[in-house]
Each structure stands twice: as structure tokens, then as C-alpha cells.
Swiss-Prot record:
Organism: Homo sapiens
Comp. bias intervals (Pro residues): 232-248
GO molecular function: actin filament binding; identical protein binding; signaling adaptor activity
Keywords: Coiled coil, Cytoplasm, Phosphoprotein, SH3 domain
Listed GO biological process terms: actin cytoskeleton organization; cell projection morphogenesis; defense response to tumor cell; modification of postsynaptic actin cytoskeleton; negative regulation of lamellipodium assembly; negative regulation of protein localization to plasma membrane; negative regulation of ruffle assembly; neuron migration
Name under which the protein is recorded: ABI gene family member 3
Length: 366
């Protein structure tokens, strides 16, 4: 720092003053050399003396300029070093300020994280004036207050209590062997008011029908006889006497079906059973050995059509052969395909000759 101060206050100003003094001295030397050269009789000697003064003056000026430039560069270096020192001090001060701020922040965070002990006191404070309580009043329950809410349903308890049985629409008759027949549904008799036939007056057919009807009615109804109604008596065993005609009082009820109605209808004699069908006639040996004739083969085929080929095709686009073994054709030409290859090419015969052609140029002939 002292060196920088010495350069700024002494060395550089002295060098500048020396340059100003040399400037005035060089002007006087120039005037002297000019007068001496004009007044001298020996011009050559005067010229040599002038050259010597000039060389000395230039050397003196160069030395002073170099000395001043060196002092100036030295001053700039010292100022740069001082500036770097100041910058380092400022950076250090900034780091110290940041450290101080971080310490303060940590201290504040520590104060927030400390356990705060509240002074002990009464936590629950009872109110000074309690609200008045409503006196209890018993009210009867209203069980019909929600009757108008929701979807209503029909109450069937009264109807069920009247009839004592389920409705006929909800009854599904099971397929029992006693009542089921082939081709016609079982007949369900009335559940009440069954006619009573005198003993010994029931034939085998009516006895069988009564047993079947009673079994089907019990299986279909699925419910026992209601209280207060007596079950009809069981029919007696059939006798050898012929059944009498039904009395007049029974005419109001439906006539029970006979045995012919309960029995399944006889099979149609015109239609034979599947087991009685005659076996098909054997095929001839010629039909089994010969393959089907090729499509489109007939006596009116042109002469160029081969004896056997795969199919006939019609060209969609014209094609010109690129090789000697290829076919050339125009649009609408008929070709008999004799062989197909996996690469899409086909071999066939046309009216022009035999050769190969692309398979995507043709379509099957109708």
C-alpha cells in the first residue's frame, strides 16, 4: 500500500515533469543546431554535431518514457491487487452476514420448537346460567303417520283367509305319472263339490279316472283340504256289472273323460317308425370310382381345351409376355388353368398357346 502511494504521489508526477523539461530542452537544442548549421563554415562538422545532439535527446526521451510507463504498470498491478483484496473482504463479509442470518433463523426455529408450558388452570368452565330444561311430556305413538310414504301394496290376507287356498294363477301342475298323458294336458277337477257316485256303480274306466283325477288334484294344489270340508270317499273296487247311465243330478257337472280320451292317440299308420325305415340302396361301383366331371366340360368345347384342368378363368387386364414361356392375352380371354403355384403364378392353356401367367390378372369364369 505504501508503494502504491509512493508511485501515485512521487514517482509518476516526477516522470511527467521530467518529460515536460526534456520537451523544452529539445526545443532549445533544435534552435541551437539550426543556427550553428547556418553560421558554420564547415557544414559537415555542423551536421555531425547536430546528429549527435539528436541521438542523445532521443535516448533521454526514450529512457524517461520507459521509466514512466514502468511506474504506471506497477501502479495498475498494485491497484488490481488492492481491488482483489477488497473483493475478498466483501465476500468474507457477505458470508459472515449469511452465517449470522442462518444462526438467527435457527435460533427462531428453536424458539418455535420449544415446549410451551401453559400455566395450570381450570380447563372446563361451567356456564354461569344453565339453559332451562323442557319438562318431559309423554305423547302417544302414532303408528299411521308414515302410511302415505312409499309405494303401496295390496293386502291379500283377507282374501286368503276367505278362500283358504292359493289362487289358480299361481299354481303350476307338476308332471306326475298319474295325470300326465301323451299329447294332451291333464284335466284338473274342481277342488270342491265333487259328485258322489253310489257304491258298486263305478266301472274300471271311471275308477281309473277318479284315481288319476284325485292324484293330480292333490299334486297340483299342494295344500290339504280346508277345515270344515269333508274329503270325498274313495271309490270302491270295480264290479262285473255294466255301469248305469249317470243320474240327472250329475248333468250339471262336466262329464269325466273315458279311457279312450285319457289314452294317447294311436300312431299314424301311414308314417313308418324310424326303426322300420328301409336302408338306402347301395351306390354303384361306377359312381364311387369316377371323379366328378370338370366344370364347363361338354361336347361343344373348343379344340384347344385340354382334357383335364382345374378351372376356367377370364382375364381382367391385358398382359404382354416378358419371357418365352409366358402367355400374352388381352382383356376377356378365356384360359384353362392346369396348375397353380404358391408364388401367385398359374400355368394354363388358352387359344394362343400354353404358358405361365399372373394369377391376379384373372377371375373365375361363371
Amino acid at each position: 500500500m505504501a508503494e502504491l502511494q509512493q508511485l501515485q504521489e512521487f514517482e509518476i508526477p516526477t516522470g511527467r515533469e521530467a518529460l515536460r523539461g526534456n520537451h523544452s530542452a529539445l526545443l532549445r537544442v533544435a534552435d541551437y543546431c539550426e543556427d550553428n548549421y547556418v553560421q558554420a563554415t564547415d557544414k559537415r562538422k555542423a551536421l555531425e554535431e547536430t546528429m549527435a545532439f539528436t541521438t542523445q535527446a532521443l535516448a533521454s526521451v526514450a529512457y524517461q518514457v520507459g521509466n514512466l510507463a514502468g511506474h504506471t504498470l506497477r501502479m495498475l498491478d498494485l491497484q488490481g491487487a488492492a481491488l482483489r483484496q477488497v473483493e475478498a473482504r466483501v465476500s468474507t463479509l457477505g458470508q459472515m452476514v449469511n452465517m449470522h442470518m442462518e444462526k438467527v433463523a435457527r435460533r427462531e426455529i428453536g424458539t418455535l420448537a420449544t415446549v410451551q408450558r401453559l400455566p395450570p388452570g381450570q380447563k372446563v368452565i361451567a356456564p354461569e346460567n344453565l339453559p332451562p330444561l323442557t319438562p318431559y311430556c309423554r305423547r302417544p305413538l302414532n303408528f299411521g303417520c308414515l302410511d302415505d310414504i312409499g309405494h303401496g301394496i295390496k293386502d291379500l290376507s283377507t282374501q286368503l283367509s276367505r278362500t283358504g287356498t292359493l289362487s289358480r294363477k299361481s299354481i303350476k301342475a307338476p308332471a306326475t305319472p298319474a295325470s300326465a298323458t301323451l299329447g294332451r294336458p291333464p284335466r284338473i277337477p274342481e277342488p270342491v263339490h265333487l259328485p258322489v257316485v253310489p257304491d258298486g256303480r263305478l266301472s274300471a274306466a271311471s275308477s281309473a279316472f277318479s284315481l288319476a283325477s284325485a292324484g293330480s288334484a292333490e299334486g297340483v294344489g299342494g295344500a290339504p283340504t280346508p277345515k270344515g270340508q269333508a274329503a270325498p270317499p274313495a271309490p270302491p273296487l270295480p264290479s262285473s256289472l255294466d255301469p248305469p247311465p249317470p243320474p240327472a243330478a250329475v248333468e250339471v257337472f262336466q262329464r269325466p273323460p273315458t279311457l279312450e280320451e285319457l289314452s294317447p292317440p294311436p300312431p299314424d299308420e301311414e308314417l313308418p317308425l324310424p326303426l322300420d325305415l328301409p336302408p338306402p340302396p347301395p351306390l354303384d361301383g361306377d359312381e364311387l370310382g369316377l371323379p366328378p366331371p370338370p366344370p364347363g366340360f361338354g361336347p361343344d368345347e373348343p379344340s384347344w381345351v385340354p382334357a383335364s384342368y382345374l378351372e376356367k378363368v377370364v382375364t381382367l387386364y391385358p398382359y404382354t409376355s416378358q419371357k418365352d414361356n409366358e402367355l400374352s392375352f388381352s382383356e376377356g380371354t378365356v384360359i384353362c388353368v392346369t396348375r397353380r403355384y404358391s408364388d401367385g403364378w398359374c400355368e394354363g392353356v388358352s387359344s394362343e398357346g400354353t404358358g405361365f401367367f399372373p394369377g391376379n390378372y384373372v377371375e373365375p369364369s361363371c
